UniProtKB/Swiss-Prot annotation:
Function (record text): Catalyzes the reduction of the keto moiety of phthiodiolone dimycocerosates (DIM B) and glycosylated phenolphthiodiolone dimycocerosates to form the intermediate compounds phthiotriol and glycosylated phenolphthiotriol dimycocerosates during phthiocerol dimycocerosates (DIM A) and glycosylated phenolphthiocerol dimycocerosates (PGL) biosynthesis.
Enzyme Commission identifier(s): 1.2.-.-
Alphabetized Gene3D superfamilies for the sequence: Luciferase-like domain
Keywords: Lipid biosynthesis, Lipid metabolism, Oxidoreductase
GO molecular function: oxidoreductase activity, acting on paired donors, with incorporation or reduction of molecular oxygen
Designated name of the protein: Phthiodiolone/phenolphthiodiolone dimycocerosates ketoreductase
Lineage: Bacteria, Bacillati, Actinomycetota, Actinomycetes, Mycobacteriales
Keyword Nucleus among record annotations: no
CDD domains: Tetrahydromethanopterin_reductase
Family label: Belongs to the mer family. Phthiodiolone/phenolphthiodiolone dimycocerosates ketoreductase subfamily.
SUPFAM superfamilies found in the cross-reference section: Bacterial luciferase-like
UniProt superkingdom: Bacteria
Keyword Lipid metabolism: yes
Length: 380
């Protein structure tokens, strides 16, 4: 069996000295490491408290002055494709939002990138998170139902052959709608779906080319969910084994175990654990600071937490939550952790979040062990 297929993700923050400085560096690193794909997120703000984005908590504030200054993903991928002729990596959004983005616009953006890159676009998509919808006036009462209708709309437009489309929908009704962009050589972008709950898993089985969750879960849980996705695919007449098992993982690494433990103890990386569900907290003998049964990233609203509130939440996060939530360790240790996923995952997208620590130099030096991890996973 060959090793993992590997992609690399970047948070697309507006950095210094130029807005794309960090993203370009990460892209060129991905090319040098000969990965398969490069990914960017779709957020209007970050998923940890902005009140902690201070130099005393994170050295990277010198390079990224505004943590919630997140750039737009489709624009960034177009910029990357135009500027970087080397490498010809596949380009994906991990993942776009079916809430605040009208599916017709998403269908157009993905199809456009696919044409301009000669077939290299991937449409990663999920229901989104509360933080990117509710504050901006998007109803958050039925995110999964909205997602299902968004996927049906995208498929209806892509399959229309340029003919007028009429479709009833409680969210996205189509009335004599036209979509005339062609596929690239007869193929639309692959659809990679982030799903966790039973209804979303069924939707992934119906629509996904790849099952692509993120955030905290165990390999055994992933395998069970993948079985649900493939069962749902079979129920609608699709080949269940044609669905690629993929996952996005966040990595904290360093030259030594002590450096990694120092990073994991930093306030921002511990705050990242707020994105874990209460189930993860329970496994480690705790309770989520937002309350019993809290879902984690999907319902987290971190950007209005003041500093003291954020620190009080961080203080009660069991260390095991962050360590389960993140691949962490020296390069060899992370490779060993990733190997635990080999029986259920064939494609791993890695995002280096080691810079979210107090020591800027050590955060930047994490690039070397991260690059080793990426290269070795392809052989695993």
């Amino acid at each position: 069996m060959t090793g993992f297929r590997v992609g690399v993700g970047d948070g697309i923050p507006a950095a210094r000295p130029a807005a794309e400085t960090m993203t370009r560096a990460n892209y060129l690193g991905a090319v040098a490491n000969r990965v398969d794909s490069f990914w960017v997120p779709d957020h209007l703000n970050q998923l940890f408290p902005r009140s902690l984005w201070k130099q005393k908590y994170c050295g990277a504030t010198k390079l990224i002055p505004r943590v919630d200054a997140v750039m737009e993903p489709w624009t960034m991928l177009g910029h990357i494709a135009a500027r970087n002729r080397a490498g010809r990596l596949r380009l994906g959004v991990a993942v776009t939002d079916s809430g605040r983005r009208n599916p017709a616009v998403t269908a157009q953006a993905a199809a456009t990138l696919h044409l301009l890159t000669r077939g290299r676009a991937i449409l990663g998509i999920g229901p989104g998170e509360r933080e990117g919808n509710e504050p901006y006036g998007v109803d958050w009462s039925k995110p999964v139902a909205r997602f299902e209708e968004a996927m049906a709309t995208i498929r209806a437009l892509w399959d229309s052959g340029g003919e007028l489309v009429n479709r009833d929908s409680p969210f996205f009704p189509l009335r004599k709608a036209i979509f005339d962009l062609p596929p690239y050589r007869g193929k639309w972008p692959e659809i990679w779906i982030a799903a966790h709950g039973p209804r979303m898993l069924r939707a992934a089985g119906r629509y996904a080319d790849a099952y692509f969750p993120s955030f905290a879960h165990l390999p055994t849980e992933y395998a069970q969910r993948l079985d649900s996705v493939r069962s749902a695919a079979s129920d609608v007449g699709r080949d269940p084994m044609a669905i690629l098992p993929a996952v996005q993982m966040f990595v904290v690494t360093g030259s030594t175990r002590d450096d990694v433990d120092e990073a994991l103890d930093s306030e921002l990386l511990r705050a990242f654990g707020l994105n874990a569900s209460d189930d993860v907290f329970t496994r480690h003998g705790g309770r989520h600071p937002m309350g019993a049964g809290f879902s984690g990233a999907q319902d987290l609203l971190p950007h209005d937490m003041d500093e003291q509130t954020a620190l009080s939440h961080v203080a009660v996060i069991p260390p095991g939550v962050t360590r389960e939530f993140l691949l962490n360790g020296t390069s060899d240790e992370v490779i060993q952790q990733a190997a635990q996923w080999r029986d259920c995952v064939r494609y791993m997208v890695l995002v280096n979040v080691s810079f979210l620590q107090r020591n800027l130099r050590k955060g930047l030096m994490s690039v070397k062990p991260f690059n080793k991890i990426v290269r070795e996973l392809k052989k695993l």
